[in-house]
Amino acid sequence: QKKSQDLESVQEVGGSYWQRVTLILELLQHKKKLKSPQILVPTLFNLLSRCLEPLPQEQGNMEYTKQLILSCLLNICQKLSPDGGKIPKDVLDEEKFNVELIVQCVRLSEMAQTHHHALLLLGTVAGIFPDKVLHNIMSIFTFMGANVMRLDDTYSFQVINKTVKMVIPALIQSDSGDSIEVSRNVEEIVVKIISVFVDALPHVPEHRRLPILVQLVDTLGAEKFLWVLLILLFEQYVTKTVLAAAYGEKDAILEADTEFWFSVCCEFSVQHQIQSLMNILQYLLKLPEEKEETISKAVSNKSESQEEMLQIFNVETHTSKQLRHFKFLSVSFMSQLLSSNNFLKKVVESGGPEILKGLEERLLETVLGYINAVAQSMERNADKLTVKFWRALLSKAYDLLDKVNALLPTETFIPVIRGLVGNRLPSVRRKALDLLNNKLQQNISWKKTIVTRFLKLVPDLLAIVQRKKKEGEEEQAINRQTALYTLKLLCKNFGAENPDPFVPVLSTAVKLIAPERKEEKNVLGSALLCVAEVTSTLQALAVPQLPSLMPSLLTTMKNTSELVSSEVYLLSALAALQKVVETLPHFISPYLEGILSQVIHLEKITSEVGSASSQANIRLTSLKKTLATTLAPRVLLPAIRKTYKQIEKNWKNHMGPFMSILQEHIGVMKKEELTSHQSQLTAFFLEALDFRAQHSENDLEEVGRTENCIIDCLVAMVVKLSEVTFRPLFFKLFDWAKTEDAPKDRLLTFYNLADCIAEKLKGLFTLFAGHLVKPFADTLNQVNISKTDEAFFDSENDPEKCCLLLQFILNCLYKIFLFDTQHFISKERAEALMMPLVDQLENRLGGEEKFQERVTKQLIPCIAQFSVAMADDSLWKPLNYQILLKTRDASPKVRFAALITVLALAEKLKENYIVLLPESIPFLAELMEDECEEVEHQCQKTIQQLETVLGEPLRSYF
């Protein structure tokens, strides 16, 4: 009390009074036992207030006095509240404690020592009268940012720490969570405080930067405010650092800054870091897409999310470019942080990824939500210049997702994915499935426990496939498709060892492809691929599904317009069918006719619309091969016979694919199988070979192409037969063609077949060809219009058919002569064939063009080869003479043809022709003066060529 009166009695004038005050204050400072020291408080503030008023020069420096007053106030506070808590009102009234004066002390004084005293006092008062300090908090920190933080001495550093430690908890405690307004208010003040620190950072001595920021965030609470610091650091880089950086230095500066940011983050726990990343992502989501939006929002009282949003990065005060740079930098930093050594080391030190349980799922979810938002922005800006930025940002966001994914051990990954697969956002579910698919495609040997966990996902995936969520149609289709793909991968990886969980998968996929479901095409395609995989894995376990699967699959394949319009769908259907046939060949006989019909029909269609090298055609070829090579003849042949009856009704372009299956099947039949099924096959071929006769009025070329498919197939069987087994077949076919009441068209078929067999059997065919000599000779005469006027075929296209018949006979004879090594052409056979063949030189059947073509391509090579096969000069002479006689024909075309035949004969017989030369010269001499210039010219050429062939000059004979 006495002291209080002493202090008050000091007069305002004169330096001696201040000296007394100083003395008393010094005494007070050392006085340990003071009763009711609170009585001094108003007096001390009164003195402090006087100290701050401008004083006459002679009063000297009052800084020491200020420091003493502040020190006394600090002592009183510490005495009244040893624990730093609030003081009851009846002890010391808040109103008497003038915080504003202390703040003024800080601001007006130029002396660091005074600042320190004032700040220490404020720190203590913050605990006792928090509200009083809060009103002045920004002044305190602004001052610190501008002054104290720039000093590089330990004492200043301690003052900063002390102030932060004392003032900020008071601020945080004032947010008791009573009202949103108070909380928001406190948050905004905190943002401003952090902002002061970040702004001061470039001026803070480098080695002090990290400790100051760490102390600040530690005191504020890293879980709540680390993210705010990071955002302000990014903002500082985007708005200030980049502008200040010299050209070419930006990368180095960014690298250094990023390293510093890593250091800041890694001072805090992994959990707090991950929480901060989530907060940053959520904050980025609230930012507008573009700067322009905020202008309109400002006019319309801002949108709700803007309103609720904590103002850290003020969009209105930044450019669009800065906003974009800020977003990109934020995502880029997060991605780098998660793969940085500092962070990974921290994870290991904290006890490995297990400590993240629960957090990483939320982080994944947040990242996926962010990716979804960026993807939508990219779509919205597809036609704007900024699309490049959105694409880059999306790529960075996916990069971030990969980093999050890489952090998860598989044990944690599976439950996290399981949680995300059930997420309410379709896009999150889809991305979760993608992550799972990526994991399943890694070539890893999984532990049994992990496989079990993977298999537990099957019911969750089936729920998506069965559309047990009420979401948008399109969204669901893509998710269901992805889930089917995931099931396929699971089955591929684990199904062989663990088939049971996949039985319901097959059953679900089979239900999806039922025609009455009318499923979306892409879902159907994925379901079919899933069927393919699961069937081949389950094998016998898939058999119970066949009665449901096969009819649906065959109905799907009947819908050719749908299939052809989508190659993926078509390939999926073929894959499913291929796997069923490969895996369960013994169980598909009830469906074999349907399978054959559909495969044949599809090949016809795909070959019409696409190239032979298309994926669909390759897949079809493979499927036909599987059908032909895996099924037993007892199963396949009856189905072939029944299917043929269907094919024949609609034969155009179907016969080739159909016969190719049988041809390949015959190719792989064992000898004993062929023997036991030969009669069945013979009966089938006799029926099939009647094709031409049954379609005698159709286009000859088309019929010919189709018949060749049947013949190729039959020849495939013939080459596998022995002479003993082929002979009866040959006679059967011969009788089939030659019986009295047989249609003439059968001869076309038979001679075509004989030609093809002659080509395949080569010299062996001469064992059977003897029976053909007379029929060939007779037919050659019957279709020679220089000998008969009668039509051979009773149809409008008789000449075309006769030309074709001639072609087959001449080709077949040529091959018999060419491959003959057994002296097949005896004198009798030579005589039987000689005139019918030579007379063909006069047969102008089919018109001039056809005649010339036939003579050049078939007749002349055949006669020339005939002469070689005779190998007898006694037979050459009559042959040569008969040909020479034709050079006297009334028609110049015939004379011309005969002349070329003479030359062909000479070219084949070479020096042996010399014996025939004397006989030939008179005929050639006549032709040298032929009335037809063309013939005369050809004769001269022929003589020249004969000279070359025989190696003798012939000019002297003419």
Swiss-Prot record:
The modification Phosphoserine is found at residues 4, 305. Gene3D superfamilies: Leucine-rich Repeat Variant. It is found in: Nucleus, Nucleolus. Transmembrane segments: none annotated. The keyword Phosphoprotein applies. Keywords: Nucleus, Phosphoprotein, Ribonucleoprotein, Ribosome biogenesis, rRNA processing, Transcription, Transcription regulation. One of its GO terms (biological process) is protein localization to nucleolus. GO terms for molecular function: snoRNA binding. The keyword rRNA processing applies. GO terms for cellular component: 90S preribosome; nucleolus; small-subunit processome; t-UTP complex. Its main location: nucleus. HEAT repeats lie at residues 920-956. Part of the small subunit (SSU) processome, composed of more than 70 proteins and the RNA chaperone small nucleolar RNA (snoRNA) U3. Interacts with MYC; the interaction is required for localization of MYC to the nucleolus. Belongs to the HEATR1/UTP10 family. Ribosome biogenesis factor; required for recruitment of Myc to nucleoli. Involved in nucleolar processing of pre-18S ribosomal RNA. Required for optimal pre-ribosomal RNA transcription by RNA polymerase I. Part of the small subunit (SSU) processome, first precursor of the small eukaryotic ribosomal subunit. This is HEAT repeat-containing protein 1. It comes from Macaca fascicularis.
